[in-house]
Amino acid sequence: MGEKKMKKWVSMGLLACTTLLFAACSSGNKASKSTQETTKSTEVASGASKSGYADPKSLKNNYDVIIVGAGGAGMTAAIEAKDAGLNPVIFEKMPVAGGNTSKSSSGMNASGTKFQKAQGINDSNDAFYEETLKGGKGTNDKELLRYFVDHSAQAVDWLDQNGIKLDNLTITGGMSVKRTHRPSDGSAIGGYLVQGLLRNVAERKIPIFVNADVKDIKANDGVVNEVKVQIQGEKAKSIKGKAVIVTTGGYGASKKLIAKYRPDLKGYVTTNSKGTTGDGIALVEKLGGQIIDMDKVQIHPTVNQEKGILIGEAVRGEGAILVDDEGNRFVNEMDTRDKVSAAINALPKKRAYLIFDQGVRSRATAIEFYAKQGYVKEGKTVAELAKTIKVNQANLEQAVTSWNEAVANKQDTAFNRTTAMDHPLDTANYYAIQIAPGIHYSMGGVKINTNTEVLDKNNQPIKGLYVAGELVGGLHGDNRIGGNSVADIVIFGRQAGQQAAKFVSAQ
């Protein structure tokens, strides 16, 4: 399937970004009627179908590499392992593949890419490193971060070589230049990326078993090389490999873990898919893996509170502003997520409105999905919009006027915003989305080295065990920059597949 056909799936991928109910590693019971109905609807949404997944009857007793979790990191690792000549298998606990990757919105950060150069954007790995380190409050694992930025452009190239082109650029909070790569039409990256990875997995005939609950991971003779998996609720089976890669995502949907590590976040909605419950972290810890930073949970500032739907950072990156219930701006909208969230939580009702015009809507096409969900309020003029959302008309008009002056002068004297100031808000119609903060990402998890090898409590690698994606701890420090998660799963997913292949080949 070519890129042209893939693009036909992008709109469906947007739906997948919010309706897919999966994440990564271990679930359990036989599918109920409601689960079967959910599976059917999510397959339609994502472009996936039962025919695209492996028949449980085809399960073999042995594979070269066993991958637990079919999100972006897991599929990327599988592709690299296959291309290295190995025979990988993927086990996914949910009814469909994709995980939290399917819910990704803004894009993928990378520095010094060919797409940046083509648009005259001057960027460097060092700038990317320093801005990410600042965003993480200096607590990032510096070795992981250095590897991350230095391999980001290669990751964009690798995707492009595999028919997944990300040549439309925007910017996220905490970044100084446009380094957030997204699909050509400016749509959300999640559905597009998942479909591209699924296509590549299918072309290579890599089996993905869904409803496959990995109950345990074992080591034999000092090497991690076996899993116990239960497929579709049937009797669990032991499957042997030569290495295991765990890519099961974080714990942002686990009320139990959030209550344990961040009780202050009780009652917050979550943007995470339902399977993002930290299962893989527990499995790795049982094997002696070192677990770090579990109290570091990111709150995203712009979340729909009814369904926990993330309103992507690209909306602000294309020029939107935030106003309070009185219609006044109150924050630098392009500051880091922790600071913007704190500013919203300091408001009396702990909520705000994204305000934007038709120009922003045309550049950030993910907004069309939000509109279909009923989240977008509209007015032919700013005054009409103020009446619609019931904020002070004079204040909102002044907020927009002042912002447009700041854009014209390239100087925001009110809140010192310096990025995403390319376009004024002056093209009718005008729009608003009510938002508030929600649980979005877990920065804590498994400690690894730059080879994605899991480290034990003595910082020694556990042979045969690799980890990539959101269940890794340390890379993002105290706060993740928007667009770095997708980069993370591709960069370290590739590395996990490559390093596992080297390990297996050396045996």
Regions found by a protein language model. Give the residues of each.
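Helical element adjacent to the flavin cofactor pocket in flavoenzyme catalytic cores
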Residues: 185-242, 281, 287
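N-terminal Rossmann-like FAD-binding beta1-loop-alpha1 element of flavoenzymes
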Residues: 63-90
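C-terminal motif of bacterial Sec signal peptides marking the signal peptidase cleavage site
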Residues: 21-24
